[in-house]
Amino acid sequence: VTDKRYAQYFGFTEAEAKAVLEYYGLKLDEEVKAMYDGYHFGKEEIYNPWSILNYADTGELAPYWVNTSSNKMIRKAMEGRDQAFARGYEELIEKGKLETLVRMETSFFEVSSTESLWGLFVNAGYLTIEKVISARDGRYVLRIPNEEVQQEFRDLTASYLNVSESDLSAMINGLRYEERERFAQSYAD
Protein backbone atom coordinates (compact mmCIF):
# COMPACT_ATOMS: atom_id res chain seq x y z
CA VAL A 1 0.00 0.00 0.00
CA THR A 2 2.98 2.31 0.18
CA ASP A 3 4.34 1.63 -3.32
CA LYS A 4 2.96 4.12 -5.86
CA ARG A 5 3.60 1.69 -8.72
CA TYR A 6 0.64 -0.41 -7.59
CA ALA A 7 -1.77 2.36 -6.56
CA GLN A 8 -4.02 1.96 -9.60
CA TYR A 9 -4.65 -1.69 -8.73
CA PHE A 10 -6.17 -1.00 -5.31
CA GLY A 11 -9.17 0.97 -6.52
CA PHE A 12 -10.40 3.66 -8.87
CA THR A 13 -8.47 6.82 -9.54
CA GLU A 14 -10.57 9.98 -9.51
CA ALA A 15 -10.74 9.97 -13.33
CA GLU A 16 -11.93 6.34 -13.34
CA ALA A 17 -14.53 6.94 -10.62
CA LYS A 18 -15.80 10.00 -12.48
CA ALA A 19 -16.07 8.06 -15.76
CA VAL A 20 -18.00 5.18 -14.14
CA LEU A 21 -20.44 7.53 -12.42
CA GLU A 22 -20.97 9.66 -15.52
CA TYR A 23 -21.74 6.51 -17.52
CA TYR A 24 -24.60 5.86 -15.07
CA GLY A 25 -25.75 9.49 -15.10
CA LEU A 26 -24.28 10.38 -11.73
CA LYS A 27 -21.80 13.06 -10.69
CA LEU A 28 -18.63 12.79 -8.67
CA ASP A 29 -19.47 15.61 -6.26
CA GLU A 30 -18.11 16.52 -2.83
CA GLU A 31 -20.64 14.30 -1.06
CA VAL A 32 -19.51 11.24 -3.05
CA LYS A 33 -15.85 12.13 -2.45
CA ALA A 34 -16.41 12.44 1.31
CA MET A 35 -18.15 9.07 1.39
CA TYR A 36 -15.88 6.94 -0.84
CA ASP A 37 -12.56 8.74 -1.45
CA GLY A 38 -9.67 9.18 0.93
CA TYR A 39 -7.45 6.16 0.47
CA HIS A 40 -3.79 6.85 -0.24
CA PHE A 41 -1.70 4.27 -2.06
CA GLY A 42 1.74 5.58 -2.76
CA LYS A 43 0.89 9.21 -3.47
CA GLU A 44 -2.30 8.40 -5.36
CA GLU A 45 -5.81 9.25 -4.11
CA ILE A 46 -7.95 6.17 -4.60
CA TYR A 47 -11.69 5.54 -4.40
CA ASN A 48 -13.22 2.36 -3.04
CA PRO A 49 -14.23 0.49 -6.24
CA TRP A 50 -16.84 -1.73 -4.57
CA SER A 51 -18.65 1.28 -3.16
CA ILE A 52 -18.41 3.32 -6.37
CA LEU A 53 -19.85 0.43 -8.41
CA ASN A 54 -22.67 -0.14 -5.92
CA TYR A 55 -23.45 3.58 -5.83
CA ALA A 56 -23.47 3.63 -9.65
CA ASP A 57 -25.86 0.67 -9.65
CA THR A 58 -28.30 1.95 -7.02
CA GLY A 59 -27.85 5.72 -7.16
CA GLU A 60 -28.01 5.68 -3.37
CA LEU A 61 -25.16 7.12 -1.31
CA ALA A 62 -24.80 4.40 1.34
CA PRO A 63 -22.05 2.49 3.17
CA TYR A 64 -21.40 -0.51 0.91
CA TRP A 65 -17.86 -1.26 2.13
CA VAL A 66 -19.10 -2.61 5.46
CA ASN A 67 -20.99 -5.38 3.66
CA THR A 68 -17.84 -6.81 2.06
CA SER A 69 -16.71 -8.63 5.19
CA SER A 70 -17.22 -8.95 8.90
CA ASN A 71 -15.11 -6.91 11.29
CA LYS A 72 -14.81 -9.92 13.62
CA MET A 73 -11.16 -10.37 12.65
CA ILE A 74 -10.32 -6.79 13.65
CA ARG A 75 -12.37 -7.05 16.84
CA LYS A 76 -10.60 -10.27 17.82
CA ALA A 77 -7.19 -8.73 17.10
CA MET A 78 -8.08 -5.76 19.35
CA GLU A 79 -8.95 -7.95 22.34
CA GLY A 80 -6.57 -7.66 25.27
CA ARG A 81 -4.39 -4.97 23.70
CA ASP A 82 -1.86 -3.09 25.78
CA GLN A 83 -1.97 0.53 26.93
CA ALA A 84 0.10 1.70 23.95
CA PHE A 85 -2.63 0.54 21.56
CA ALA A 86 -5.40 1.95 23.77
CA ARG A 87 -3.73 5.38 23.87
CA GLY A 88 -3.17 5.35 20.11
CA TYR A 89 -6.74 4.26 19.42
CA GLU A 90 -8.11 7.01 21.67
CA GLU A 91 -5.94 9.59 19.90
CA LEU A 92 -7.16 8.34 16.52
CA ILE A 93 -10.80 8.66 17.56
CA GLU A 94 -10.29 12.03 19.26
CA LYS A 95 -8.09 13.73 16.65
CA GLY A 96 -9.00 11.78 13.53
CA LYS A 97 -5.41 10.78 12.90
CA LEU A 98 -2.46 9.16 14.60
CA GLU A 99 1.31 9.22 14.13
CA THR A 100 2.63 5.78 14.98
CA LEU A 101 4.92 2.92 14.08
CA VAL A 102 3.31 0.50 11.62
CA ARG A 103 4.39 -2.93 10.49
CA MET A 104 2.80 -3.39 7.07
CA GLU A 105 4.02 -6.89 6.31
CA THR A 106 1.72 -8.73 8.68
CA SER A 107 -1.21 -11.09 8.64
CA PHE A 108 -3.98 -11.71 11.13
CA PHE A 109 -2.05 -14.63 12.58
CA GLU A 110 1.00 -12.42 13.23
CA VAL A 111 -0.75 -9.60 15.06
CA SER A 112 1.27 -9.85 18.23
CA SER A 113 2.41 -6.25 18.48
CA THR A 114 0.71 -2.88 18.37
CA GLU A 115 2.68 -2.03 15.21
CA SER A 116 1.35 -5.17 13.51
CA LEU A 117 -2.23 -4.35 14.51
CA TRP A 118 -1.94 -0.89 12.94
CA GLY A 119 -0.62 -2.63 9.81
CA LEU A 120 -3.67 -4.90 9.80
CA PHE A 121 -5.94 -1.83 10.06
CA VAL A 122 -4.21 -0.29 7.02
CA ASN A 123 -4.16 -3.49 4.97
CA ALA A 124 -7.84 -4.19 5.75
CA GLY A 125 -8.88 -0.68 4.64
CA TYR A 126 -9.90 0.69 8.04
CA LEU A 127 -7.09 3.25 7.95
CA THR A 128 -5.06 4.91 5.26
CA ILE A 129 -1.65 6.52 5.29
CA GLU A 130 -1.97 10.28 5.32
CA LYS A 131 1.74 10.94 5.51
CA VAL A 132 4.96 8.98 5.48
CA ILE A 133 7.21 10.19 8.29
CA SER A 134 9.90 7.54 7.75
CA ALA A 135 9.23 4.49 5.57
CA ARG A 136 12.54 3.00 6.67
CA ASP A 137 11.52 3.16 10.34
CA GLY A 138 7.86 2.35 9.64
CA ARG A 139 6.55 5.65 11.03
CA TYR A 140 3.37 6.99 9.44
CA VAL A 141 0.46 9.30 10.09
CA LEU A 142 -2.71 7.22 9.80
CA ARG A 143 -6.31 8.38 9.48
CA ILE A 144 -9.78 7.02 8.81
CA PRO A 145 -10.17 7.39 5.04
CA ASN A 146 -13.77 8.51 4.58
CA GLU A 147 -17.28 8.75 5.99
CA GLU A 148 -18.16 5.22 4.92
CA VAL A 149 -15.37 3.73 7.04
CA GLN A 150 -16.02 6.28 9.82
CA GLN A 151 -19.47 4.74 10.23
CA GLU A 152 -17.91 1.30 10.63
CA PHE A 153 -15.42 2.74 13.15
CA ARG A 154 -18.29 3.89 15.35
CA ASP A 155 -19.51 0.31 15.61
CA LEU A 156 -16.00 -1.02 16.11
CA THR A 157 -15.26 1.56 18.80
CA ALA A 158 -18.51 0.88 20.63
CA SER A 159 -17.58 -2.80 20.70
CA TYR A 160 -13.98 -2.07 21.77
CA LEU A 161 -15.11 0.17 24.63
CA ASN A 162 -18.08 -2.07 25.42
CA VAL A 163 -20.58 0.82 25.23
CA SER A 164 -23.75 1.47 23.24
CA GLU A 165 -23.57 3.54 20.06
CA SER A 166 -25.59 6.34 21.69
CA ASP A 167 -23.16 6.49 24.63
CA LEU A 168 -20.29 6.43 22.16
CA SER A 169 -21.81 9.38 20.25
CA ALA A 170 -22.08 11.33 23.50
CA MET A 171 -18.46 10.47 24.34
CA ILE A 172 -17.18 11.51 20.90
CA ASN A 173 -19.15 14.76 21.02
CA GLY A 174 -17.71 15.43 24.46
CA LEU A 175 -14.20 15.01 23.07
CA ARG A 176 -14.90 16.88 19.86
CA TYR A 177 -16.30 19.92 21.62
CA GLU A 178 -13.79 19.73 24.46
CA GLU A 179 -16.44 19.04 27.06
CA ARG A 180 -14.32 16.80 29.24
CA GLU A 181 -16.94 16.50 31.98
CA ARG A 182 -19.54 15.33 29.46
CA PHE A 183 -17.07 12.80 28.10
CA ALA A 184 -16.20 11.53 31.58
CA GLN A 185 -19.88 11.21 32.50
CA SER A 186 -20.67 9.30 29.29
CA TYR A 187 -17.68 7.03 29.84
CA ALA A 188 -18.64 6.37 33.46
CA ASP A 189 -22.23 5.51 32.50
Label each region the model flagged.
Residues 1-189:
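Phosphate-binding site recognition
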